[in-house]
């Protein structure tokens, strides 16, 4: 029985899941919007939101914790220089998940994962 067990296995080993979410979190922080399957998006939110909360207080210890969880210097740099200050007044809910239909190959539900309050480029006319 799996009562009270949190998290999805996503048909992967634990090491594969950890590596996948490290990479996905780093990509999310770098691009601020990524497209993935809906179950992965919902699990990514559980990884990304605590990292942004960590980035609100810029310290060497917090930077090391963030680097241990993403293994990306660029992601950590952006996290503490841009994203932490941007969400200073927000008490959580930094990630938005938007459903975007189904993948053509296997009909998997797809979703965009984006950071809220991200600067959107103006559409060129």
Swiss-Prot record:
GO terms for cellular component: cytosolic large ribosomal subunit. InterPro entries: Ribosomal_bL17 (IPR000456), Ribosomal_bL17_CS (IPR047859), Ribosomal_bL17_sf (IPR036373). It comes from the Bacteria. GO terms for biological process: translation. Keywords: Ribonucleoprotein, Ribosomal protein. GO terms for molecular function: structural constituent of ribosome. Disulfide bonds: none annotated. It holds the Pfam family Ribosomal_L17. Part of the 50S ribosomal subunit. Contacts protein L32. Belongs to the bacterial ribosomal protein bL17 family. This is Large ribosomal subunit protein bL17. It comes from Marinomonas sp. (strain MWYL1).
């Amino acid at each position: 029985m799996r009562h009270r067990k949190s998290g999805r296995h996503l048909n992967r080993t634990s090491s594969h899941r950890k590596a996948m979410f490290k990479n996905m979190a780093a990509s999310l922080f770098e691009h601020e919007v990524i497209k993935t399957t809906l179950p992965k998006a919902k699990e990514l939110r559980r990884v990304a939101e605590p990292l942004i909360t960590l980035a609100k207080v810029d310290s060497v210890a917090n930077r090391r914790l963030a680097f241990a969880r993403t293994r990306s210097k660029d992601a950590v740099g952006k996290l503490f220089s841009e994203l932490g200050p941007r969400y200073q007044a927000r008490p959580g809910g930094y990630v938005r998940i938007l459903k975007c239909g189904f993948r053509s190959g296997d009909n998997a539900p797809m979703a965009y994962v984006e950071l809220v309050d991200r600067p959107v480029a103006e559409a060129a006319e």
